């Protein structure tokens, strides 16, 4: 079972005076931390926030994901979460949040935090079966559908990967403000594990997912089956790797990240292992001489619960911090990670307290949105109150 513990990270105060944790090799630089605070406060009114929805048939494997209690409900998790992020707990929502074994969708946290600071998100989708009931950018034809299960070793056609990458690059190059990138991809931690493993990063004991008891053995078997028939070599072509064992979010996000950095825009990656897989793939795609400049204004924002999760091989530091260290070592770069200060230990709502015992943990950019709220003067006390109010509203529907 996973557990939360004190980890080797630095405590850092944001503008709300509430504290967050910072980690990664760049966390020891006060100038970088102050630069982060300035970037993500002075421009809060005009940041570009993009939530990418994507689908993979990997999510239909029994027991692989808790982002919906059944494989049928996981098919509409992404559109339900996106609709909640946009509109909150209103009765007019078309897509009900999928039933969970415990907890509540992290979209509730993301909605509360983003609403308090006035950040509106653009929704983009690739590989979603449903037709969204809200404005949504279709990155590709909806007829493409979800990517195949990664056990096939043929998740996507290489042309699809190329097209998604180019669409992301095009959007990134057009950015004129800092980018907050978030995602909702049921089954996405498994595709992230596959991609990181394919890049030579030993991550199978460091990636959990939304379950309280992560199906890590199952994930490992799925990844091994997907990779075993491939002849990718020690340094695989990133796009070929994504075509084999990735999902539609990944090539689009890699292109978007590369494009954003080409035009010198700071990027906050909201999430956990899925964002690290995107970052690692981007690093594998560029010349080594460019890597330090590339990562300079990239940060990874997540929740307390994910950043402090302890798994079997993460002795002395959390699994996520150990994973960041592996990516740093693999590409010889220094990364900056931050985890929000929001805790539900004393919440009056059981579905929120469930986060404290290992359920859900992260998703829909929850940690990043909370960090931005904290950095712009919103207290954790206020966030808890508003999250509890949103739960009450949800219960009335």
Curated annotation (Swiss-Prot):
Which SUPFAM superfamilies does the record associate with it? Answer: Nicotinate mononucleotide:5,6-dimethylbenzimidazole phosphoribosyltransferase (CobT)
Q: Its domain of life?
A: Bacteria
GO molecular function terms here?
Answer: nicotinate-nucleotide-dimethylbenzimidazole phosphoribosyltransferase activity
Q: Which family does it belong to?
A: Belongs to the UPF0284 family.
Spell out the protein name for this chain.
UPF0284 protein Pro_0435
